[in-house]
């Protein structure tokens, strides 16, 4: 059962969630390197995509709600940076669950397979060599 942010019922198989929506994938990628609050997720997505993807609050928080309900992300009970400015106490921080990390890895593997198939068919260019000759 894929095609949404999370499955309709609880599942321990990350594959059951695939394919993720672009919004869900962007949220999970934003959380892959640590906890973030909602606005931080929006900023990370905008920066990572060069401004091509901008998540509005309604879209973002709808996805967060569904991802939480599916056990993919969770709300953190503590602030990751106790030195943050006053007023940040109200911010809710989110993080990937262990299951959510598996979902993200499964989706990246699925997308990688699609890209490899497209390259075999000549539908997209081969990757550019990385600097340094690797």
What are these regions (language model features)?
Residues 70-87, 95:
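Beta-hairpin "wing" of winged helix-turn-helix
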Residues 14-59:
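N-terminal helix-turn-helix DNA-binding core of bacterial DNA-binding proteins
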Residues 2-8, 99-134:
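Amphipathic alpha-helical dimerization/coiled-coil segments
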């Amino acid at each position: 059962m894929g095609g949404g942010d999370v499955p309709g019922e609880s599942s321990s198989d990350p594959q059951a969630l695939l394919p993720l929506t672009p919004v869900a994938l962007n949220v999970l990628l934003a959380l892959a390197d640590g906890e973030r609050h909602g606005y931080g997720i929006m900023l990370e997505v905008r920066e990572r995509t060069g401004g091509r993807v901008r998540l509005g609050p309604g879209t973002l928080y709808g996805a967060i709600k569904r991802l939480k309900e599916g056990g993919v992300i969770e709300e953190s009970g503590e602030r990751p940076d106790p030195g943050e400015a006053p007023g940040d106490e109200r911010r809710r921080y989110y993080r990937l669950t262990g299951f959510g990390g598996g979902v993200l890895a499964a989706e990246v593997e699925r997308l990688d397979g699609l890209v490899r198939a497209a390259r075999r068919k000549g539908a997209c260019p081969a990757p550019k060599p990385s600097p340094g000759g690797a």
